[in-house]
Amino acid sequence: MRCDATQEKRAHSESGESVFFQKFLETRQILLSGEISKDLAEGIVRQLFVLESLSVSKPIYMYVDSPGGDVDAGYAIFDVIRFVKTPVYTIGMGLVASAGVLVLLAAKKDCRFGLRNSRYLIHQPLSGMRGVATDIEIHARELEKTRSKLNALIASETGVSLDKVAQDTNRDYWLDASQALEYGLISNLIEKRADLPKK
C-alpha cells in the first residue's frame, strides 16, 4: 500500500513537472539550471530543436544558472545554439561558471544578457583523472587542448586578448555582473523582462 502511494506521488510530481516545462516551452523559454551533464544537454538540445520547428523567426530565451560540468556536454549545447536558424538569447542568472559560461557565449555578443546579481567564473578545465602514468599523461594532453580551445573561444567572443584570457583562467577568475559586462561575457545588464528584445 505504501509502495503504491509512493509511486502515485512520484507520478503526480513528474506529471506536474512535465506540465511546467510544457508551459515554459510555449513561451519559448528554456531553463538551464544545475550541473551540465550529458542528460541535461540532451534535454536542452531537444527543446532547441522543438522550438526551431515551431518557428525560425521567433527568438528563444535561454536562462543559464549553472556551476559548470561536462565540457563536452557544454559544447553540444553550444553547437546546437549556433546550428539552429532561430535567434537565441542567453541570460545569465545566479551563478554562471565554467561550462556554463561556454553555453552563455553561444549566443551572439549582442544577444547575451546578465541579471543584476549574477556572478561568473572562468577557469581552466578540471580533472579528477586517476590511473596509470601513461593514461594520466594522455589525459593531461587532452586537457591542455581543451584549455587552449576554451581560451581561444573566450578571447574571440569577448574581444579580450588571448594572452590575458590565458592568464585569467590560470586560476579561478570571478566576475560580478558589471565586471562580466566590462569583460565582454555579456552585452547588457537587465533587471526586468521588458529589457529583453522581443524580436
From Swiss-Prot:
Chief subcellular location: cytoplasm
Enzyme Commission designation: 3.4.21.92
Signal peptide: none
Superkingdom of the organism of origin: Bacteria
Subcellular location: Cytoplasm
Entry-linked InterPro entries: ClpP, ClpP/crotonase-like_dom_sf, ClpP/TepA
Active site: 98, 123
Subunit structure: Fourteen ClpP subunits assemble into 2 heptameric rings which stack back to back to give a disk-like structure with a central cavity, resembling the structure of eukaryotic proteasomes.
Name assigned to this protein: ATP-dependent Clp protease proteolytic subunit 2
Source organism of the structure: Treponema pallidum (strain Nichols)
